[in-house]
């Protein structure tokens, strides 16, 4: 990837893509915030993109962090007193919460015991002096990830189950669904990770959303966006009629919202900013029309007026949303919507 990835499309002066913070203090702080929020809401050849092997998991409350290209640390929390964490189901160890442990380039596993509430966690990876964060998620039969530049992005599909998975990929772009060869019947063996360069299907530089559906088995899906300074990894989310995106820090330089309509009819999406002075509708975001099977990009930089806010999206049918926010030079924060299972929709 190059410096034109992710954040460069949001603002020209910043040449660093991804969601990065310098220094261990920011990394640890972000991990703590991620855990608290989760508990509160209950062309690059494939061989050059190494992917860590993951081990099968058994039934239970288990979360998996997609493997990172850089050395990663796993941060986990729970309302209970302890969790099991590790790099495979055979190597889980009991630890008191909150817990931080090194997983390097392996997938990270978090598991709660019977009777405990759902655990939460994140993986923090370092590469080239930069730190990136990705939440740990549960395996599912499908999910969606959005990227700003598919030409420099990968899909990472993890089969953490004990049987093979077969997945289909569908990409939604600004002009509708992208149809090309090689997107159907992709087999992922048990305990394996498959890296799929998105540039094979779309070598453009406009936002797209990839829908991954497992015909057989369950998978964990992430998106890896490449840049000159390293990479950023995001985890899959689900479509919903109502989506809440985490707080946007005050005085950010850019805020760009990516919304996709996976349905078959045209939708109108309304956006509400939740601020300390009360909710308001950002200019130009009261009704965002999206054609079927397509993706739109909305610039909210001026509309948010530099306030620290959260965002609520509402539509008559399920939509997918992701927010790309850039703060001070060299910093890009990427927020995604929680899974609908954690929301009241």
Regions found by a protein language model. Give the residues of each.
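Short, aromatic- and glycine-rich surface loops/edge beta-strands on solvent-exposed regions
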Residues: 106-116, 207-214, 308-316
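Surface-exposed interaction/gating patches
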Residues: 143-163, 238-280, 341
